[in-house]
Amino acid sequence: MEKKVLVTGASGFIGSFLVEGGLERGMLTWAGIRKTSSRKYLQDKRIRFAELNFGDKEKLKEQLTGHKQEHGGWDYIIHCAGVTKCLHQEDFDKGNYQATVNFVEALKELEMVPERFMYISSLSIFGPIHEESYEPISEKDEAKPNTAYGVSKLKSEK
């Protein structure tokens, strides 16, 4: 039986490559996108699409329920969706942290928790670490984000 994977943020740079990776591995691959997302880099006919609204938990639950009824759940979810540019700092929190909370809570409430859930964060969580020494960042380094984006991504990891 083929494994099923959902890549959220699939219209983005990293997400589009992860969709390709799922297809190359023979997985049934869903591209999780917003209704308004570009499909420019998602042209392969094998890609299945899931329109997801992370900003509205009830709408998201409706969308996930529809998917569950038609296809079941996913074996793997790679969560890349998020915002990188906002007019107001608090919008980073809504678009990254609250959206991730909505997604995880909806999956739990609908009993759609996958075998594996991977959250894609950002180097921005570390802030200006090792700027002068150019040493590699390690898991032991302390995260000290200095942007609203970095703070929202770090908060989403927890």
Walk through the language-model features, giving the residues of each.
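Structural motif
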Residues: 4, 75-76, 116
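N-terminal Rossmann NAD(P)H-binding glycine-rich loop of SDR-like oxidoreductase domains
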Residues: 5-25
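Short beta-strand element of Class I
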Residues: 28-30
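N-terminal Rossmann-fold cofactor-binding loop
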Residues: 32-37, 53-54
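Short loop/helix-cap segments at secondary-structure boundaries that form the rim of catalytic
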Residues: 38-45
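NAD(P)H-binding glycine-rich loop region in Rossmannoid oxidoreductase-like domains
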Residues: 52-97, 102, 108, 128
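Conserved Rossmann-fold NAD(P)-dependent oxidoreductase catalytic core, especially the SDR/UDP-sugar
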Residues: 79, 101-148
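Active-site Tyr-X1-5-Lys
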Residues: 144-158
